[in-house]
């Protein structure tokens, strides 16, 4: 019983996709306004992805080094523990440490 429902659902999905594509091709050939907007947006997407790719090629190592820079304040080079504000250092609590 479920197999016929799956086939029917799949058949409807394929039919709707084919009808959408045929309508899109008709609009494309007629040079409809929706196609012009699609071309502009698709061109913007492609140009943006190419620009991101080239920017990553140029600045990728710098960004990676900034994220993983070595320092005394932890994994990402945060501020050291000696630069606590007045109320944090005045509390007098012992610093918590990680124990396994």
Curated annotation (Swiss-Prot):
<dbReference type="Pfam" id="PF15128">
    <property type="entry name" value="T_cell_tran_alt"/>
</dbReference>
<dbReference type="GO" id="GO:0072675">
    <property type="term" value="P:osteoclast fusion"/>
</dbReference>
<comment type="similarity">
    <text>Belongs to the TCTA family.</text>
</comment>
<dbReference type="GO" id="GO:0016020">
    <property type="term" value="C:membrane"/>
</dbReference>
<feature type="transmembrane region" description="Helical">
    <location>
        <begin position="35"/>
        <end position="55"/>
    </location>
</feature>
<dbReference type="InterPro" id="IPR016560">
    <property type="entry name" value="TCTA"/>
</dbReference>
<keyword id="KW-1133">Transmembrane helix</keyword>
<protein>
    <recommendedName>
        <fullName>T-cell leukemia translocation-altered gene protein homolog</fullName>
    </recommendedName>
</protein>
<keyword id="KW-0472">Membrane</keyword>
<keyword id="KW-0812">Transmembrane</keyword>
<feature type="region of interest" description="Disordered">
    <location>
        <begin position="76"/>
        <end position="100"/>
    </location>
</feature>
């Amino acid at each position: 019983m479920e197999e016929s429902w799956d086939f029917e659902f799949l058949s409807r999905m394929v039919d709707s996709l084919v009808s959408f594509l045929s309508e899109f091709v008709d609009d494309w050939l007629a040079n409809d306004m929706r196609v012009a907007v699609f071309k502009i947006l698709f061109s913007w997407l492609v140009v943006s992805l190419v620009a991101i790719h080239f920017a990553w090629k140029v600045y990728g190592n710098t960004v990676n080094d900034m994220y993983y820079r070595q320092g005394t304040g932890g994994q990402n080079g945060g501020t050291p523990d000696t630069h606590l504000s007045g109320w944090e250092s005045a509390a007098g609590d012992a610093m918590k440490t990680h124990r396994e």
